[in-house]
């Protein structure tokens, strides 16, 4: 009898232990559900080189702890590679342009030869003279002329920024600034998640590669998305894709937005539209060398809304007209809801300008909160 009693007690204790464990698991599951429901998941989409990864970097600067000294040092190689890619692209394009461009100073020929023959090698190790040669060559009139024609070949947006500071980038004690890190271009391949909180609200931002071969991965991120942030580089109206020289970059972005907007899995997911690289668009419009109507003929007859011109009356009217032309082009794509419950919210952005992104993201937070409440049928 004693043995039987002990056995019953042991069974009872085991059952209680299992019950307690189950309760703990249920509590954890409930907590995870609450955390999941209280988290705003933002999916960053857009064509390659539109500025998506720069937006993520801004979130780190604004809402996390920015970049540590170690992380800044880790970016040095990527920044120097940007510098090398820039000078190699410009020097290499001189002879292939129609008409071709010659160096202004014949003594710079040996510098260009060094760039094309030595600096372009895969195992190049960035000796001190490379940065000196970059700085000298960058001042050559022929190199500058080739740079001005960069829409005729492929050149990273940060080329001028890093070539202007070639000697600084090459200094032994160089530590990148936040602006250097924002400008640095690194190809995004795969899916990267960034978590941050703003006023006790949790955000998960997913950055997905924008090149065509990367887009098949996008569907992996569609589940439980609060909102899509679609990033389009308006300044690329006179440029073609790296992966398809027959396709205009802005037209690719328009087609890409249309495919997202009309996707049957996303008919209830609203889009926050970042019309990005407004700084570069302004520069191109003011320079007057690449006319928008050459690439978008209907721009010739486009008139910006009167209230828009009045609101921006202190700015150059042609720049304002260009901005809102591209805004309206993208809004045309989203004018038909196709039976869905989604909306498009456009914003003019400059991803390398921290204050601009702070302002825009603050404006978006209320929109994102409403989308989140609607998603869980609380609104």
UniProtKB/Swiss-Prot annotation:
GO molecular function: G protein-coupled receptor binding; G-protein beta/gamma-subunit complex binding; GTP binding; GTPase activity; metal ion binding
Chain residue ranges for the region called G2 motif: 180-188
Region annotation G4 motif: where it falls in the sequence: 272-279
Identification of the protein by name: Guanine nucleotide-binding protein G(s) subunit alpha
Family statement drawn from the similarity comment of this UniProt entry: Belongs to the G-alpha family. G(s) subfamily.
SMART domains per UniProt: G_alpha (SM00275)
Positions of the UniProt region annotated as G1 motif: 41-54
Pfam (any one): G-alpha
Function field: Guanine nucleotide-binding proteins (G proteins) are involved as modulators or transducers in various transmembrane signaling systems. The G(s) protein is involved in hormonal regulation of adenylate cyclase: it activates the cyclase in response to beta-adrenergic stimuli.
Species this protein is from: Schistosoma mansoni (Blood fluke)
GO CC term, one of those recorded: cytoplasm
UniProt subunit comment: G proteins are composed of 3 units; alpha, beta and gamma. The alpha chain contains the guanine nucleotide binding site.
């Amino acid at each position: 009898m004693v043995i039987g009693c002990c056995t019953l007690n042991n069974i009872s204790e085991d059952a209680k232990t299992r019950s307690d464990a189950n309760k703990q698991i249920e509590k954890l599951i409930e907590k995870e559900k609450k955390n999941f429901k209280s988290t705003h998941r933002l999916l960053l989409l857009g064509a390659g080189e539109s500025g998506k990864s720069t937006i993520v970097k801004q979130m780190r600067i604004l809402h996390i702890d920015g970049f540590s000294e170690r992380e800044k040092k880790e970016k040095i190689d990527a920044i120097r590679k940007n510098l090398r890619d820039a000078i190699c692209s410009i020097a290499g394009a001189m002879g292939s342009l129609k008409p071709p461009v010659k160096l202004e100073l014949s003594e710079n020929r040996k510098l260009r030869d060094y760039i094309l023959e030595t600096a372009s090698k895969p195992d190049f190790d960035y000796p001190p003279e490379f940065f000196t040669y970059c700085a000298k060559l960058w001042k050559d009139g022929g190199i500058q002329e080739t740079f001005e024609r960069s829409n005729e070949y492929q050149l990273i947006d940060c080329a001028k920024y890093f070539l202007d500071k070639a000697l600084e980038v090459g200094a032994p004690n160089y530590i990148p600034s936040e602006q250097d890190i924002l400008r640095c271009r690194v190809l995004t391949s795969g899916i990267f998640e960034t978590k941050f909180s703003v006023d006790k609200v949790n955000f998960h931002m997913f950055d997905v590669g924008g090149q065509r071969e990367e887009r098949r991965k996008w569907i992996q991120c569609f589940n439980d998305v609060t909102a899509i942030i679609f990033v389009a580089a308006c300044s690329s109206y006179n440029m073609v894709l790296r992966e398809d020289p027959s396709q205009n970059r802005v037209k690719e972005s328009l087609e890409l937005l249309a495919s997202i907007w009309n996707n049957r899995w996303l008919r209830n997911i609203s889009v926050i539209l970042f019309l990005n690289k407004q700084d570069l668009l302004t520069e191109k419009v003011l320079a007057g060398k690449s006319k928008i109507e050459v690439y978008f003929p209907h721009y010739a007859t486009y008139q910006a809304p009167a209230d828009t011109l009045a609101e921006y009356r202190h700015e150059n009217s042609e720049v304002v007209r260009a901005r809102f032309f591209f805004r309206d082009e993208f809004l045309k794509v989203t004018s038909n809801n196709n039976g869905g419950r989604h909306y498009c919210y456009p914003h003019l952005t400059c991803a390398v300008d921290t204050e601009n992104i702070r302002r825009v993201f603050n404006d978006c937070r209320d929109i994102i909160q409403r989308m989140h409440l609607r998603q869980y049928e609380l609104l």
